[in-house]
Structures are given as structure tokens and as C-alpha cells.
Amino acid sequence: MYNRLNARLSGEDKSRNPVTLIWDEYIANILALANEDKKKAAVVMNKVSEILLMGRSKSVRLIVSCQRPDAVAFPVGSRLNYGVVVVLGAFVRSVYDMLMPDHIEQVKGREFGLGEGTVLLQGSQLHFIKVPKTSNVEELCKGALS
């Protein structure tokens, strides 16, 4: 992903078809890598930051998911470059302090049920959401891909 972004930035790759990396359990991966090799983990986090900073203009996108964010794996600079931030589940002050600090007052005291939470668009538009429960995931996937 990082090499594809650099090829687009340098002009070597002139294509603009969207490229998206979905990284499930990002925090767990980064923390495990940091336990093995802190320098390598820092290199990976710097590359993630660069993808977030430069990727949008070249149609290179990164989607990460995690059970609970950790400041170690989300340096302040990279946190600011996520275009869409979704938080599902119970209000945890530390999560909102890290990912949506300007919107804590709007969320504080609110109770979220299963599949409910917030979405922050481009750092300014906060919305309350509910992800619907579905029993036909396979059918939805087939429909989305056709």
C-alpha cells in the first residue's frame, strides 16, 4: 500500500482507481510489533501517518478497526487525518478524548445500545448512528459486489 502511494506521488503510477487497505485489529497488530521491535513499529506507524496525510489526493485510503484505541498506536498527527471516525458502544471518556475531543459535550451522558454510537465526518460533523442488525450478510455482500 505504501509503495503504491509513493508510486502515485512520484508520477510513476498515473492511475487513480481507488485503492483501499482494510486493517482489522490495527492496535493489536501495532502493539504486538512494538513488543518485538519498537523501531519497526515506529516505521510502520510513520507509514500509516503518511498514507493518511497524502493518500486521499491519490485515491489511496486506509480503514482501520480496533476494539479500543490506544494513543501509542495513534500518534496525534495521524489521528487528525482520519476523514471518518466511528465509535460504537458505551461512552468511554478516554476514547472520545483521543478521537473526538471537540465533541465530548455532545456525547457525554448519552447511553448507547448494541450497534449504536457516533460518526465524525471530516473532523466537524458529528452524527449519532445505529448499525442495523442483519441476518442476510451473504446476500448483502453479493448485492454490494454485483
Sequence positions of predicted segments:
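Substrate-engagement module of ASCE P-loop NTPases
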Residues: 1-4, 41-64, 91
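Mechanochemical coupling/switch segment within NTP-driven translocation systems
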Residues: 1-23
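Signal for well-folded cores of large energy- and translation-related assemblies
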Residues: 2, 6-10, 31, 52-56, ...
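Conserved catalytic network of the ASCE P-loop NTPase/AAA+ motor domain
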Residues: 9-15, 47, 52-59, 77-81
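Short beta-strand segments at enzyme active-site cores
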Residues: 20-22, 62-66
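Short, glycine/acidic-enriched loop or turn micro-motifs at the edges of active sites
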Residues: 27-28, 70
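Flexible beta-alpha connector loops of hexameric P-loop NTPases
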Residues: 28-45
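Conserved ATP-driven motor cores of ASCE-family P-loop NTPases powering translocation/secretion/packaging/pilus
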Residues: 64-145
